[in-house]
């Protein structure tokens, strides 16, 4: 296959054509030795290789990104979900196991070489994978750990390798053909350290532990003109998902235990795929948006607060006094430092059985003011001083 035939056979875009090399060019330039190429073909007898394309990643760069095998799988799966949602409006991906080989498959448009372009690819704002380089990092991370990765679409095969001939090692896509015709994209991961059962928690609607626990699923826009996407709250503790994809235990990623679990669409992770300290306030604001839209979620939320002792009617002063002292080591308690969801005060009152007396509740500053308010026929409510001023919609007591 000459160069013109090579470019046409793989529909190599003009932006990548200058970087791509035919098999003959790669051997002539010493990018691959004849023995390395022969070994590559022996290890993949189902494929016929015709050339290569550099990825522009070194092993050192991939190592600095601190990916894990699980994060790599997450990147593959979220790309599959994005593709199918873009095509059909509904996210879908399949995994299957053949011995030690794991397959991740979708019925999207089928991956093209443009996905391997240096600098990443353009993503829609609603997509799960919005940085554009996740697929390349996922594949090179696994290959750096001697886990072979091949991507298939149409009758094309994109096999990721680390060339031993290049100085310090360079990652390449080896371009090949297969006798099969593939619809969508299939990713083959040989010697996979994870099996398909391990992957179930990675996707919120795959996780059997969350089945039947949904309390709220609220669809809303990030900003005018953006698509409406769902954020959810679950009656299950301590899990965080972003755009259906698993981030981790809330106690680990947000450094606070959570009484409930959350799947937040319009919250963004850092480019490192982690939750950074500076973005934690945005996490609470996004949870607040879901709570503001869902009465059942507010009711459960307040019930959890009361069960944890954060909200109660206390008689420690010898009078009934509402006390709200959130535990800041919990997500649900710390939320009130940043926001008070719409309708939450009403939920407090309903949970405490004071709906008929809500107009008598007064916010007080200290114990003395609580006693005085009670003597005037009011129900005093004490709030922790660090809480958001949005709670000041509760009328203050005036003597």
Regions found by a protein language model. Give the residues of each.
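N-terminal assembly/transducer modules of large multi-domain enzymes
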Residues: 2, 6-89, 145-150, 154-399
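Compositionally biased, low-complexity repeat tracts
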Residues: 26, 47, 95, 104-106, ...
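Short amphipathic alpha-helical segments, especially helix-boundary/capping motifs
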Residues: 49-56, 97, 113-116
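Short, flexible coil/linker segments at or flanking structured domains
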Residues: 51, 60-61, 92, 104, ...
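Alpha-helical hydrophobic/aromatic positions enriched in membrane-embedded helices and signal peptides
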Residues: 71, 98, 124-126
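Short beta-strand/loop element within the Bergerat-fold HATPase_c
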Residues: 91-99
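Short beta-strand element(s) in the Bergerat
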Residues: 100-102, 185
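Flexible ATP-lid and adjacent glycine-rich G1/G2 motifs of the Bergerat
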Residues: 103-161
């Amino acid at each position: 296959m000459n160069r013109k035939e090579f470019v046409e056979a793989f529909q190599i875009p003009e932006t990548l054509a200058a970087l791509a090399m035919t098999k003959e060019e790669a051997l002539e330039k010493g990018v691959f030795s004849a023995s390395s190429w022969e070994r590559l073909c022996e290890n993949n007898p189902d494929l016929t290789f015709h050339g290569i394309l550099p990825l522009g990643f070194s092993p050192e760069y991939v190592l600095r990104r601190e990916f894990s095998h699980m994060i790599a799988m997450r990147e593959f799966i979220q790309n599959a979900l994005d593709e199918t949602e873009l095509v059909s409006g509904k996210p879908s991906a399949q995994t299957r196991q053949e011995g030690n080989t794991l397959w991740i498959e979708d019925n999207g448009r089928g991956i093209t070489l443009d996905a391997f372009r240096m600098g990443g690819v353009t993503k829609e704002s609603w997509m799960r994978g919005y940085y554009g380089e996740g697929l390349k990092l996922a594949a090179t991370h696994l290959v750096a750990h001697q886990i072979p990765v091949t991507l298939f679409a149409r009758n094309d095969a994109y096999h990721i390798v680390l060339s031993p001939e290049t100085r310090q090692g360079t990652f390449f896509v080896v371009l090949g053909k297969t006798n099969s015709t593939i619809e969508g994209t299939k990713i083959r991961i040989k010697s996979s350290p994870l099996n398909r059962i391990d992957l179930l928690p990675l996707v919120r609607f795959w996780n059997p532990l969350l089945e039947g626990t949904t309390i709220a699923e609220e669809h809303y826009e990030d900003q005018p003109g953006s698509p409406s996407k769902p954020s959810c709250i679950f009656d299950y503790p301590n899990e965080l998902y972003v755009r259906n994809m698993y981030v981790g235990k809330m106690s680990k990623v947000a450094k606070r235990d959570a009484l409930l679990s959350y799947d937040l669409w319009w919250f963004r992770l850092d480019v490192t795929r982690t939750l950074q300290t500076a973005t934690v306030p945005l996490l609470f604001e996004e949870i607040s948006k879901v709570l503001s839209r869902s009465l059942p979620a507010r009711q459960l939320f307040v019930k959890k607060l009361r069960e944890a002792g954060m909200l109660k009617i206390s008689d420690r002063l010898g009078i009934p006094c509402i006390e709200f002292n959130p535990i800041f080591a919990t997500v649900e308690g710390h939320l009130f430092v940043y926001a008070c969801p719409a309708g939450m005060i009403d939920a407090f009152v309903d949970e405490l059985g004071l709906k008929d007396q809500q107009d008598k509740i007064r916010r007080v500053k200290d114990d003395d003011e609580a006693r005085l308010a009670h003597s005037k026929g009011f129900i005093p409510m004490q709030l922790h001083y660090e809480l958001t001023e949005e709670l000041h919609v509760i009328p203050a007591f005036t003597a």
